[in-house]
Structure formats: structure tokens, C-alpha cells
Curated annotation (Swiss-Prot):
Organism placement in taxonomy: Bacteria, Bacillati, Bacillota, Bacilli, Lactobacillales
Superkingdom: Bacteria
Cofactor binding comment, as recorded: Manganese or magnesium. Binds 1 divalent metal ion per monomer in the absence of substrate. May bind a second metal ion after substrate binding.
Keywords: Cytoplasm, Endonuclease, Hydrolase, Magnesium, Metal-binding, Nuclease
Gene name, Swiss-Prot/TrEMBL: rnhC
UniProt family annotation: Belongs to the RNase HII family. RnhC subfamily.
Species per Swiss-Prot/TrEMBL record: Streptococcus pneumoniae (strain ATCC BAA-255 / R6)
SUPFAM superfamilies noted in UniProt: Ribonuclease H-like
Positions annotated to bind a divalent metal cation: 84-85, 187
GO cellular component: cytoplasm; ribonuclease H2 complex
A Gene Ontology molecular function term of the record: magnesium ion binding
Catalysis: reaction(s): Endonucleolytic cleavage to 5'-phosphomonoester
UniProt domain RNase H type-2: residue ranges: 78-290
PROSITE patterns for the chain: RNASE_H_2
EC number: 3.1.26.4
Protein name per Swiss-Prot or TrEMBL: Ribonuclease HIII
Length: 290
């Protein structure tokens, strides 16, 4: 899905609104002045003056403001915040979310370090480069422990809305540190409509427009950095939880997790699983019936 961020003049904004006034739609985001649902695109006009165009027809509508596709500035050439999460698909371990701020002058350093999507790197490589990234790159890391995850899921949050809350909070806290991104990219885990719906429940908000992009870790180094740091945080948490229980906790939610879950249930009961696992996964019922 194409995503374009522009900062046109107020005169151009008003001309755009007049031209497409029949496409105006309501928005629950207090930082969006105007929201338009157009054929093959949505347009969010923020109080900050920025405009976010998303969808297959984004370039067409951006041309109204003089935008040309050949002039599109890649996210790699902008000061950028990127976010990613790790642990969502694993029965054991917490949920780690990281927002990282990367500037173009850091790109060579990151490439030489071998930064890429954590899914393409070995755990050994991640544990090796993550401490360097934590020291050199401004970031905000959040970890929701399994016990806290189990406490909030089904009460205030579901598996998607809890990620919205964590991504939003990580970005908010990083912005509070004074970074000034020209773009904010989230590795898409839900639709923009769903994200905005759940975001309305959150207290800490910011006016910067965000872009949800699929496979963003392969497009933006800031997202790749977040992916690596989040993976390292998740692995560290997995090790620490296992050490306290005396078990080696596997990542993922396959048969290996079923086996260990059954053993922990026999040794510690549900209290043990609540300490180290996400209970709403099917692995819990499998462990009970083993």
C-alpha cells in the first residue's frame, strides 16, 4: 500500500478540500483536522499541517499538491521512527515492542553492522549486535511480561489492541526524548482503520502522522533496528523466565511448546504457566488435556 506524507500550504489544503468535499468523513483522531475517503485512497490532514495519503491511488491525489512519483523521498533518506514487535506468535515469553529513531547519516554504520529484519538473522547475530544498537541508536523499548499480558487480555485489550497500545506508547515516549522524525512507520500488524479504532482508547497521543506498511523491516533501517532490539529483548526475557522455572522455554507455539507447557503445568500448576506463557493460546488447553 502506497503511503505519502506531504506538507503543503494551507491554500493548497483548502483547495483540495473544496475539490473533494463530498469525500469528507468523520475521524476519531483528535489530531486529524479533516479525513477523506476517496476511491483507492484515504487522506488524513493533521493539525500539524502534514497530510498522509494512503492506498493504491495515493500518488494520483498527491499530484494535486505538485507531487511526482519520481521525486518521492524514500524513508531511508529521512529522519525516521520505525517500530516493530516480537513475541506475538510465541506461547512462551512476553511481548516486546521497540521504536527506534534513525537518521540518514547512520545508514552506513547500520549496514556495516549487518542490520536487517530480525527474522533473517540468527539469534547469535542478534545478541551480538543488539547491545551496540542500544548504545548508538535512540530508541524506546517496552516489554509486556506474560503475567501482565494475561492480566490485560480479555479485560481491556485483545491481541491486536494491546499491540496498538504498546506501539503508540513506544513512539510517544521516544518523541518525548526530543527526536524530530519526518516520518513514522509501523510494521503493519493490522489495518489502518483498526489501528485508529483502538488508538482512540489510548491516553498518550501525538500529532505526528503514522504510516502502517507491510514488510517495513525490509524497507526502513529504523524498523529493522527496532526488529533486532525487540528480538533481543524477547530472547532475554525467554531465558530469564525459563531460568526461574528450571526449564528451557522454546520460541513459537508448536509441539515443542506443547510439551514444555504440559511439564510446567504438572510442576507448578496454572500459576506457573501464567508466569511464563500467554494463556489464551491453544497450547494451554493442549497442556491441560495432555
Amino acid at each position: 500500500m502506497a503511503s505519502i506524507t506531504l506538507t503543503p500550504s494551507e491554500k493548497d489544503i483548502q483547495a483540495f478540500l473544496e475539490h473533494y468535499q463530498t469525500s469528507l468523513a468523520p475521524s476519531k483522531n483528535p489530531y486529524i483536522r479533516y479525513f477523506l475517503k476517496l476511491p483507492q485512497a484515504t487522506v488524513s490532514i493533521y493539525t500539524s499541517g502534514k497530510i498522509l495519503l494512503q492506498g493504491e491511488g495515493a500518488e494520483k491525489y498527491a499530484s494535486f499538491f505538485g507531487y511526482q512519483a519520481v521525486e518521492q523521498t524514500s524513508g531511508q533518506n529521512l529522519p525516521l521512527i520505525g517500530t516493530d514487535e516480537v513475541g506475538n506468535g510465541s506461547y512462551f515469553g512476553g511481548l516486546a515492542v521497540v521504536a527506534a529513531f534513525v537518521t540518514p547519516d547512520q545508514h552506513d554504520f547500520l549496514r556495516k553492522l549487518g542490520v536487517g529484519d530480525s527474522k533473517t538473522l540468527t539469534d547469535q547475530k542478534i545478541r551480538q549486535i543488539a547491545p551496540i544498537l542500544k548504545e548508538k541508536i535512540q530508541h524506546q523499548a517496552l516489554l509486556l511480561s506474560p503475567s501482565k499480558y494475561n492480566e490485560v487480555i480479555g479485560d481491556r485489550y485483545n491481541a491486536v489492541s494491546v499491540k496498538v497500545a504498546l506501539h503508540n506508547q513506544a513512539i510517544y515516549l521516544l518523541l518525548q526524548k526530543g527526536v524530530q522524525p519526518e516520518k513514522i512507520v509501523i510494521d503493519a500488524f493490522t489495518s489502518a482503520k483498526n489501528y485508529d479504532k483502538y488508538l482512540a482508547q489510548e491516553t498518550n497521543r501525538f500529532s505526528n502522522p503514522i504510516s502502517l506498511e507491510e514488510k517495513a523491516e525490509g524497507k526502513y533501517l529504523a524498523v529493522a533496528v527496532s526488529s533486532v532490539i525487540a528480538r533481543d529483548l524477547f530472547l532475554e526475557n525467554l531465558e530469564n523466565l525459563g531460568r526461574e522455572l528450571g526449564y528451557q522455554l522454546p520460541s513459537g507455539a508448536g509441539t515443542a511448546s506443547d510439551k514444555v507447557a504440559s511439564q510446567i503445568l504438572q510442576a507448578y500448576g496454572m500459576q506457573g504457566l501464567n508466569f511464563c506463557a500467554k494463556l489464551h493460546f491453544k497450547n494451554t488447553e493442549k497442556a491441560k488435556n495432555a
